[in-house]
Amino acid sequence: MSTVEERVKKIVCEQLGVKEGDVQLTSKFVEDLGADSLDTVELVMALEEEFETEIPDEEAEKITTVQDAIDYILANQ
């Protein structure tokens, strides 16, 4: 089983069409990885599906980096 970090990075790569080497823990989805608002919504939906959790909109707005996503998943598993 992959770690949460590996799974989050894989989803980010798939959703945003970026190379794994370009995805750092500090990478911001919009500024660093070129995501737009639709991309971020789809990214949150993919994370919800992968980790079988629900991320409320007010929490989703706070998830702006790869590390934010990992931290949220770990805190809410």
Swiss-Prot record:
It comes from Hahella chejuensis (strain KCTC 2396). The keyword Magnesium does not apply. This is Acyl carrier protein. The keyword Glycoprotein does not apply. 4'-phosphopantetheine is transferred from CoA to a specific serine of apo-ACP by AcpS. This modification is essential for activity because fatty acids are bound in thioester linkage to the sulfhydryl of the prosthetic group. It is found in: Cytoplasm. Residues 2-77 form the Carrier domain. The gene is acpP. Pathway: Lipid metabolism; fatty acid biosynthesis. The modification O-(pantetheine 4'-phosphoryl)serine is found at residue 37. Keywords: Cytoplasm, Fatty acid biosynthesis, Fatty acid metabolism, Lipid biosynthesis, Lipid metabolism, Phosphopantetheine, Phosphoprotein. GO terms for biological process: lipid A biosynthetic process.
